[in-house]
A protein has these predicted regions:
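Catalytic-center loop of serine/cysteine hydrolases
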Residues: 108-134, 162, 166-315
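An N-terminal, helix-rich hydrophobic module
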Residues: 1-122, 233
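Structural signature of tandem alpha-helical TPR/SEL1-like repeats
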Residues: 308-314, 343-361, 384-401, 422-435, ...
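Conserved structural position within tetratricopeptide repeats
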Residues: 320-321, 360-364, 400-404, 435-438, ...
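Alpha-helical protein-protein interaction modules
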Residues: 399, 412, 417, 426-615
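Helix-start (N-cap) detector for alpha-helical repeat units in TPR-like alpha-solenoids
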Residues: 290, 327-328, 370-371, 410-411, ...
Length: 615
């Protein structure tokens, strides 16, 4: 059998135009060009109209971007439809074709969602970076103290090395004319691969102090290096080897602080801002064991979780039992106790009064402390939340006294902001939350408090920017109040994310709350079945209060013991704003009496001598 003749390249080239002509004939036969041009004309008109409407109604940029992506996605769909149905007499779609189009749209929708989610995450990161990154060069008289490395053989002394770094930071923070980055801001760069210049840029400082601590038997070695971030050069370095005693520890810390100030003064020169001298405290306990207990307890308080707080209270109680004159141990114990009741700890029934007693003892030993005054203040507000005798006037007076003694006390700003927020003074609450972030830019609870205040004040876009910045850092708290906003904007994925933060352990409740916000068919019977899933005695108070609120069982809200009543000022539920339960909650928190004495917040007003309204 003979082989067929081979096709020469020249023959193939001659056939190609015939193939192209055949394809062009099919394209014309199916009127694909007409379909595509018609679609592009309609799409252009729609896009232009959407742009005009968006500008007049101040739509977010992402809405126009999403609409554009949808129109682009329609091009291949139109071409496909034209191929199969452009010829005359082929106007109906089969079930298979409808399914294919649905799959294409679904895939396109997923791609658009991923693009939009990535865009939103990037926006949140940019917002976070904008808050972290100063717009001008860092002042020469500025420094951040990074967490000192734990070089102990067992590697279990991080709390101790952190304590050494924090003591030095505290010494430097009281030096006049010197800007010192907060502990929270600086310590977030623990074990990071970011270079010193970049860390300094993010913190808005010119100089970085880093170091290490090694405990070995009865001796301690502390090394420290001062770095000029602008040149990435070491300005000063020193290693201290001493017997391990509290007097020596404080002596080393004081030497480092003094040397740092001297080096900065020399580096800044006569043209720079004047830098004062560090006020060097004396060792306030002679017992190394007691100091070790204090450092462990204090570290657990700063990294607070429910188990951490219980252990922190135990360690700090042991410290004050062994040295009743250790003022800072009493101070930290007071701070642990005052927040424990609202973190769900129940081992001791009267945490708040125990906190007041510890704060009083700390001030008897050292009247110059700031935090005990803040504890006294927030304790008064907490007593009101518990239905006991407390005073709003005393709460605010004590918190203000704390800030008089230490204007950089971020916790005092946070607690005073929360107190103003509970009372409905949203402008004052916003100012203190902003001051808290000025004092400690990495204090995420301050950022979330500010987001809630902005939300309740009707500044929704600003609130969402702050909320997303916190979420980008992994912060979770009071998310439930943002759920109705996501639902109203049609952001179902965002809604699920918000609800999951507080209800992931109860998937059935999560599903019910999601449906209550998205499904018009979600009715009274389903609400009734969902309510028992909330345990107001053991659930997170914010989650329990928010769950009742979303399910519209307003009468149950007052039964939740919580240190915050942000729910009172949330404006996303018109029924709640007019409810008797809301007014009753305001009265239970004894706000009207304070308002009549000190002035009503702008959104409320008196009605005669005994009544009020807060529409």
């Amino acid at each position: 059998m003979s082989e067929p003749p081979a096709i020469k390249p020249a023959d193939a080239a001659l056939r190609a135009p015939g193939l192209l002509r055949a394809v062009w004939v099919r394209i014309k036969e199916h009127r694909m060009v007409q379909w595509t041009l018609a679609y592009l004309a309609v799409a252009y008109t729609l896009l232009h109209g959407a742009e005009l409407l968006g500008n007049s109604l101040s739509w977010p940029h992402t809405a126009l971007r999403l609409f554009t992506l949808l129109l682009i996605l329609g091009v291949p769909v139109v071409i496909t439809l034209a191929w199969y149905h452009g010829a005359r007499g082929h106007g109906r779609l089969s079930a298979t074709e409808i399914m294919v189009i649905a799959i294409l749209l679904a895939v396109g929708g997923v791609l658009i969602w991923r693009d939009t989610a990535t865009h939103r995450a990037a926006e949140a990161e940019r917002a976070a970076a904008a808050e972290e990154s100063p717009g001008t060069a860092a002042p020469a008289a500025s420094i951040a103290v990074l967490p000192f490395a734990d070089l102990s053989q067992a590697g279990d002394q991080a709390y101790f090395s952190d304590g050494v770094a924090e003591e030095i930071l505290n010494d430097l923070s009281h030096v006049s004319g010197l800007k010192v980055a907060s502990r929270t801001s600086s310590f977030q760069f623990r074990n990071t691969d970011i270079g010193i210049p970049e860390i300094a840029r993010k913190l808005g400082v010119r100089h970085i102090l880093e170091g290490s601590v090694r405990k070995a038997g009865d001796t301690v070695r502390i090394s420290a290096q001062l770095i000029d971030a602008a040149s990435d050069q070491h300005l000063w370095a020193q290693t201290f080897d001493r017997p391990l005693t509290t007097a020596n520890l404080f002596g080393i810390q004081d030497e480092i602080a003094t040397d740092i100030v001297q080096q900065l003064t020399s580096a800044i020169g006569t043209a720079g801002a004047a830098v004062g001298r560090p006020a060097l405290p004396e060792a306030d306990t002679a017992s190394l064991d007691v100091y070790d207990l204090y450092l462990k307890g204090h570290a657990l308080f700063l990294a607070r979780t429910k188990p951490n707080l219980s252990e922190a209270a135990r360690l700090l109680r042991a410290a004050v039992d062994q040295d009743p004159k250790f003022a800072r141990a009493w101070e930290s114990l007071a701070a642990v106790l005052v927040i424990s009741r609202f973190w769900g700890l129940t081992e001791e029934q009267d945490y708040v009064r125990a906190a007041i007693q510890a704060a009083d003892q700390a001030l008897r030993l050292d009247p110059g402390l700031s935090l005990p005054y803040a504890v006294r203040g927030i304790a008064q507000a907490n007593l009101i939340a518990l239905g006991q005798e407390g005073s709003w006037q005393e709460a605010l007076a004590q918190l203000s006294e704390a800030l008089t003694r230490d204007p950089r006390n971020a916790s005092a700003y946070l607690w005073r902001s929360g107190t103003y927020f509970n009372l409905g003074y949203l402008d004052r609450a916003r100012q203190d939350a902003e001051r808290c972030l000025d004092a400690d830019a990495a204090y995420e609870l301050c950022r979330r408090t500010l987001a809630l205040v902005e939300l309740c004040a009707g500044r929704t876009d600003a609130a969402l920017r702050l909320y997303e910045a916190g979420m980008a850092r992994g912060y979770v708290n009071a998310d439930v109040y943002f759920a109705p906003v996501a639902a109203a904007r049609g952001d179902r994925l965002g809604l699920l994310g918000i609800l999951s933060q507080q209800y992931r352990a109860k998937p059935q409740l999560l599903q019910s709350l999601y449906r209550s916000l998205t499904d018009p068919a979600f009715g009274p019977q389903e609400r009734k079945e969902a309510l028992p899933l909330i345990d107001r005695q053991h659930d997170d108070p914010e989650a329990a209060m928010g769950g009742y609120w979303l399910l519209k069982d307003y009468d149950q809200i007052a039964g939740v013991v919580n240190d915050s009543v942000a729910v009172i000022w949330s404006r996303s539920d018109p029924e709640w704003l007019k409810s008797a339960a809301r007014k009753s909650l305001i009265e239970r928190w004894r706000m009207p009496a304070y308002w009549r004495a000190q002035g009503f917040p702008p959104q409320c007003k008196p009605l005669g001598r005994a009544d009020f309204t807060c529409p």
